[in-house]
């Protein structure tokens, strides 16, 4: 018999019982903390979410980090005025108190070639991160096959450059191989104030599978949003349920420590 993770309300109860003094809270952003928007620039971070993250950062002794496909500089803009520890760019960047590491950029010519897929009226949106390039087709789903062919041709035109394609929710991202969120989290957990704590991660997409995979070896717990992954402690229905769970955890621990 397959044991399924505990769903929404019960998962929220489990989450609320976590001991903030002993965990490292690791949070995906798009589709987890905030709702996915038609384009990456259209997302919104509400003040109550900022407040919950600020309180939880204090309660965990600073062991709260964002784990995102976005570059860290974009995360800083989204969550301003806070500059939280982060694994950015699907593991291409890591910051604890400063940017510790960053992957080598993809060649400009390759990025330019890939970006040519965003023809006028196609609905395809280019997100050039330097070390990777993401092509969002949420507004032009009919172009997915053409987009995959374009990416394959672009990679073939640069045989000396090792790349791989990371699929996500209506997005295809060309990046360096062996760069992923899981390895980024593993490295993050080596640094204070994360070292020695139990990592608790919430994610929603196939791009988060590498984190779920490393959690058992780190003694951690994983929660997902809207879909089932193996080995999880629970599943939240939607980002609003995640935000409510964070608010509940922040409030309960805040009350106990006051």
Residues of each region from the PLM?
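Short amphipathic alpha-helices and their capping/turn segments at secondary-structure boundaries
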Residues: 5-21, 74-78
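Asp-based phosphoryl-transfer active-site loop
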Residues: 18-38, 66, 185
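Substrate-recognition/cap helix-loop segment adjacent to the acidic, metal-dependent catalytic center
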Residues: 70-89, 143-163
